Amino acid sequence: MFKLLGLTLLMAMVVLGRPEPPVNSYLPPSDSYGAPGQSGPGGRPSDSYGAPGGGNGGRPSDSYGAPGQGQGQGQGQGGYAGKPSDTYGAPGGGNGNGGRPSSSYGAPGGGNGGRPSDTYGAPGGGNGGRPSDTYGAPGGGGNGNGGRPSSSYGAPGQGQGNGNGGRSSSSYGAPGGGNGGRPSDTYGAPGGGNGGRPSDTYGAPGGGNNGGRPSSSYGAPGGGNGGRPSDTYGAPGGGNGNGSGGRPSSSYGAPGQGQGGFGGRPSDSYGAPGQNQKPSDSYGAPGSGNGNGGRPSSSYGAPGSGPGGRPSDSYGPPASGSGAGGAGGSGPGGADYDNDEPAKYEFNYQVEDAPSGLSFGHSEMRDGDFTTGQYNVLLPDGRKQIVEYEADQQGYRPQIRYEGDANDGSGPSGPGGPGGQNLGADGYSSGRPGNGNGNGNGGYSGGRPGGQDLGPSGYSGGRPGGQDLGAGGYSNGKPGGQDLGPGGYSGGRPGGQDLGRDGYSGGRPGGQDLGASGYSNGRPGGNGNGGSDGGRVIIGGRVIGGQDGGDQGYSGGRPGGQDLGRDGYSSGRPGGRPGGNGQDSQDGQGYSSGRPGQGGRNGFGPGGQNGDNDGSGYRY
């Protein structure tokens, strides 16, 4: 009996240990109080209190919420047609391909095709759903092929796929990385679209690659390869080379680093493409592009190192161009302006200046490598030198000839002097530097700076300021009077009438002298009547003024007194009577037989202080 009782208890425990099947496996979900916790592939969530927790196809609640993590065929994680709640929310992360997100409170978290909420949000990563027009845009949708972003609040965050035509929000933002959607016209542009049209107002695609038109107001695509840059604010940042016709901004900027564009027109006002296209005519030039013919700026710069661009007409040439199309490049195909035509020219000139006596000229004719010419010059001696030459690749071959006869003098004849008439005849003679008539014969002779000269020898027969009739060098003339003497610097005096015969004799600076010897027979300030001396000087008397009758040079006369000695600077003293203390009168030796202050015989010896004495005085 106990065995039977134990078996009964064991069976009861087995029966009690088996769980009952859930109610929602047999009954439809409640429309009033709740939703099944783990609804299956078709249950409808409650319209009042909630939604199925993870149903695979059930319709979420229109009032209280949406399925949390559905995985099936409805609207949850993998729902394909379920409609999200219009009031309280949207599926959290469903992959539905057509479900409509809530138009009031939210949007599906990651649906792949559902239409985002028109009021509160957009699917987080939908691939084609239309983003919210009011509150947001899909967060990171991937492959949406036509969804329209929100026109009010935002744009898809990080679209990564191949959207080819969706229109971005026209109010608040643009798709983050759409590849073809049209960016917002108001607030932004796609981050990296490949062809969509950027915003005309606030921005441009960040790195579009294939041709989208950038904003004409605020920006340009960051790295587009051919899109048209903004006409107002900017240009593509760093396009990589395939834009073949995009027009950069004409106001504010140019593409930053385009590397292969072959025809885009850069900005005419503010900048130029960084690497390639036609540079700006106003502000800059491409930095270091590889363009094959772009024209650099004619105002501000030249391409940095483009291998063929035509250099600037105003500021400089390309830094190191070596390409195949620009003017000046070293490659084949460009107009490099080589001098491949033979040179051909002809010129001639002749200069004649009669007042200065200049006469010269040159003529030349060239045809290819062969040159002929002639130049001529009037030489100082009156002849004309003519050089005729030929030049070619074999060298320079001159032939020299002369015309006319050379003058006899050593210099050109002049028509007159500074202030008088000259009659000389030789080089730098028969003329004077100024405006007189010169007929003299000797070098710088026969003429004078300021008067009439008739003498024949060099710097003789003339005087600076009077009439001269003498014949010797710097004789027969005086600076300021009439001279009749025949010797060099004799027969004349600077300021009076002189009748002496020898050099610097027979004349005196300021009076009448009748002596015949050098610096004798005359005195600086008195009357000299001695024979060979005939004048008074500092010797042979006393220097106090008077008449001198000495007969030797610089003796027999004194500057200011009466001297009776005979020898030069002897037999007299500068300041006393002959015969006194310090006076020598014994042997007529110049400045000898005594000294100025004592009675010795040998004094200064047989020679004078300032000249050569041979016993006959201060002769020289």
UniProtKB/Swiss-Prot annotation:
Keywords: Cuticle, Repeat, Signal. Residues 22-376, 390-620 are annotated as: Disordered. Elastic repeats lie at residues 42-56, 57-77, 78-97, 98-112, 113-127, 128-145, 146-164, 165-179, 180-194, 195-210, 211-225, 226-244, 245-262, 263-276, 277-292, 293-307, 308-324. Residues 310-321, 423-432, 583-595, 611-620 have a biased composition (Low complexity). Residues 342-415 form the Chitin-binding type R&R domain. One of its GO terms (cellular component) is extracellular matrix. One of its GO terms (molecular function) is structural constituent of chitin-based larval cuticle. Residues 1-17 form the signal peptide. One of its GO terms (biological process) is chitin-based cuticle development. It comes from the Eukaryota. Its strong elasticity suggests that it may be used for industrial and pharmaceutical applications. Recombinant protein can be cast into a rubber-like biomaterial by rapid photochemical cross-linking. The resilience (recovery after deformation) of cross-linked recombinant resilin exceeds that of unfilled synthetic polybutadiene, a high resilience rubber. Residues 67-81, 90-99, 137-147, 156-166, 235-246, 255-264, 322-334, 411-422, 433-513, 523-563, 573-582, 596-610 have a biased composition (Gly residues). Plays a central role in insect flight by providing low stiffness, high strain and efficient energy storage. PANTHER family: PRO-RESILIN, STRUCTURAL CONTITUENT OF CUTICLE. This is Pro-resilin. It comes from Drosophila melanogaster. The gene is resilin.
